[in-house]
Every structure is written in structure tokens, then in C-alpha cells.
Design a protein with these regions (language model features):
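Helix-loop-strand module that forms the ligand-binding subsite of alpha/beta enzymes
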Residues: 56-136
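A general structural signal for well-ordered alpha-helical segments in protein cores
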Residues: 7, 20, 24, 60, ...
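N-terminal beta1-alpha1 ligand-phosphate binding loop
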Residues: 2-34
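N-terminal beta-loop-helix "entrance" segment that forms/cooperates
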Residues: 42-58, 154
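A generic structural motif
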Residues: 32-38, 138
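Glycine-rich phosphate/pyrophosphate-binding loop and the adjoining helix
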Residues: 2-4, 8, 49, 138-186
Length: 186
């Protein structure tokens, strides 16, 4: 595949020192050269309201265009109440509407969940996967990425310091590269 593939990365946490933003940055650094990962900011997206579909806010339009332009999507999220944070759910909803015009349709995807807790965002990871099935986002099934104890993976500057995690994420990104190439819309 000769061209570099554009991967839109959505980080579920809006927190300034987010573990998941650090994780997304690490994934970008470890990605094979065929993939260019860029974080799509979701914190300022207006809350989805179907009443605005006929005259959508500029933020919705720009977000939808950015997702449509991407070759693939990667979600990096913490877990809030066994689900994804509200900002990520809102972004998913904004990108999926109006009905029949989803920006997500057919884009190969993957989910990485990270948290300080031991289960590594398992609930959020699987809840998000349910939405991706409905949105026709073929999500990579293996390897799965539940990164528990993730607060210990990074130094004060946000750099990945855990060698085992580095190798796992490198392998994950290689598998994701293969998945994207196999599932990309032509």
C-alpha cells in the first residue's frame, strides 16, 4: 500500500494530564510508518441535539469532515461508570448523525482503554465496541488492549517508561496496521 494512512485518534479523557492522552501519544510514536496518527480534539464539540441537524453548528461540521477524511479511527479511553466518558459518547453521536450520513461508516477501528485500576477500562472498551458494531466500524478484535495500572507507565514528562508496555503497544500498532490495510475502504 504506497501511501501513508491517516488515523483519527479520539481520546476519551479531557483531563490535562490524562493517562489516555499520554497513551495516544505513545501509540503515535510506536506506530508503523504506514500510519500517521493525529488526535482529533473533542472537548469543545457542542452537545449533540437532533434539533440542530438541519443547521448544524460549525464544530459539528468540522468534526464530521475530519472523520470522513480519515482512513481509520483509533479510540483511546478511560472508563467512567463502566462506559466511555460523556465527551467521547458525544463525539460518537455527532459523527453518526444525521441518520444515514455517519462519518464513521466502514472505517477500520480499534479500541485501547487505560486506567490506573487493575481491569484497565474493560467495561468502557466493551461498551464502546457495542456502539462501533452499530456504526459499521470494523473494530480489531485481537490483540485486545486493556491497560491497567497505566498511571505507572509514564514519566513526569508523559514519556512511556515501561518496557513491557512499550513492546505490547508496538505489537498492537503493528496488528492495527495490518487490520487497517485489510479493511480500508477503497
Amino acid at each position: 500500500m504506497g501511501k501513508t494512512l491517516d488515523v483519527a485518534v479520539l481520546v476519551g479523557s479531557l483531563r490535562k494530564d490524562s493517562i489516555n492522552r499520554k497513551m495516544a501519544n505513545a501509540l503515535a510514536e510506536l506506530a508503523p510508518e504506514e500510519l500517521k496518527l493525529s488526535i482529533v480534539e473533542i472537548g469543545q464539540l457542542p452537545i449533540y441535539n437532533q434539533n440542530a441537524d438541519e443547521n448544524p453548528p460549525a464544530g459539528w461540521k468540522a468534526f464530521r469532515e475530519r472523520i470522513r477524511a480519515a482512513d481509520a479511527v483509533l479510540f483511546v479511553t478511560p472508563e467512567h461508570n463502566r462506559s466511555v466518558p460523556a465527551a467521547l459518547k458525544n463525539a460518537i453521536d455527532v459523527g453518526s448523525r444525521p441518520y444515514g450520513q455517519s462519518a464513521w461508516n466502514g472505517k477500520p477501528g480499534a479500541v485501547v482503554s487505560a486506567s490506573p485500576g487493575g481491569v484497565g477500562g474493560f467495561g468502557a472498551n466493551h461498551h464502546l465496541r457495542q456502539s462501533l458494531v452499530f456504526l459499521n466500524v470494523p473494530a480489531m478484535a485481537q490483540p485486545e488492549a486493556y491497560c491497567g495500572g497505566a498511571d505507572k507507565f509514564f514519566d513526569a514528562n508523559g514519556k512511556l517508561i515501561n518496557d513491557g508496555t512499550r513492546q505490547f503497544l508496538k505489537d498492537f500498532m503493528q496488528a492495527y496496521n495490518t487490520w487497517v490495510i485489510a479493511n480500508i475502504k477503497s
